[in-house]
């Protein structure tokens, strides 16, 4: 009798971890609307759980529960609803949230918008599976963004410096070279370490500390090929994770692409200790996908047809930037969005500006005059610039030089407008100085080559070259002590 009890106990011990309740397969599709499928008679559906969908032809798709009403569930299908019917389609509710495999080996790889490899390489050997919505971060554990990320672009580094952990968007428009700017920043971006100027080094090549996560949403094949080829040819692919959602991919996939990218960035930053720059392009495509889902759910539309919760939804993406106390890494976000009809009051840039910490403005007039990158510094702003620059981080004179460039450029713009009314003959000699500065600033400082990487010190020295056009008396934003040290005006 005792041996029978032992045998029974052994059988239970061996089998108890392997016995599970089988998942129910549902064939109760009640309707299809755009990217959404309505499933009836579901036993205890859960909000945000993943649904495995098998079509009549044997292909598999994934979806996520968007809405629950009793035993009725609304599922958004990531790969699109084409081919789904109410006879042959079966659905399994997994009870799990959408997670993505993450690993340090993802660096140098190319994935589609759902996180599946498309570069011909093997699947990712996951070190962890993380919820794509991200982990909750205790606000009191966040640290203030400090220290600068060097982009190699003078107008950004000198006048709109980006701090590690900051979120700052690039406001562009159709036909402007925002993709070129994004690729150039990926090539050139690196860290600037603390210390004095003599001991400070450009850490752009310290790839073990710096990484880039690039997510493209709704791009065409030509643009996707451009990014892949550019990263591979310039060696930046080794430190980059690339996610590509193409224009012919399902629109609904754009909802999860930035979240998968940010989940990967969080792992690299907080678990691997890397300083990660996340570039998301184009957030307008993401917002349009959000509007499509909202329309399919027949929700009450907000401004221009976008859902009323778009502000909250965008915040769930942008607010995942930052630094955490006790963790070495950081996440800096540079989302790119195209303003419809060049309208900065459009809901997408308008709401983005409320959430983020500044903006970098790409200007069509500068682009039409063959100036690259066509970044207009006057409407541009970096709210955290003051914490990223100065002695020990960049250079002591950085803030004063930036302020003086802004002041002189603004005055130069006013003088140019006045010249159009009264003519050049009516201008004073001082006005002519500002006009000369305006032209040289745009042609020498703003304008730079696609493959011209300027260090922050190169850019500051170039700024001083332009400021020396003026006598010391006109450089009112710079202290006498700094002028005495840095101002060496040529007498020739």
From Swiss-Prot:
GO terms for cellular component: proton-transporting V-type ATPase, V1 domain. SUPFAM superfamilies: P-loop containing nucleoside triphosphate hydrolases. The keyword Membrane does not apply. GO terms for molecular function: ATP binding; proton-transporting ATPase activity, rotational mechanism. It comes from the Eukaryota. Belongs to the ATPase alpha/beta chains family. V-ATPase is a heteromultimeric enzyme composed of a peripheral catalytic V1 complex (main components: subunits A, B, C, D, E, and F) attached to an integral membrane V0 proton pore complex (main component: the proteolipid protein). This is V-type proton ATPase subunit B 1. It comes from Acetabularia acetabulum (Mermaid's wine glass). The lineage of its organism: Eukaryota, Viridiplantae, Chlorophyta, Ulvophyceae, TCBD clade.
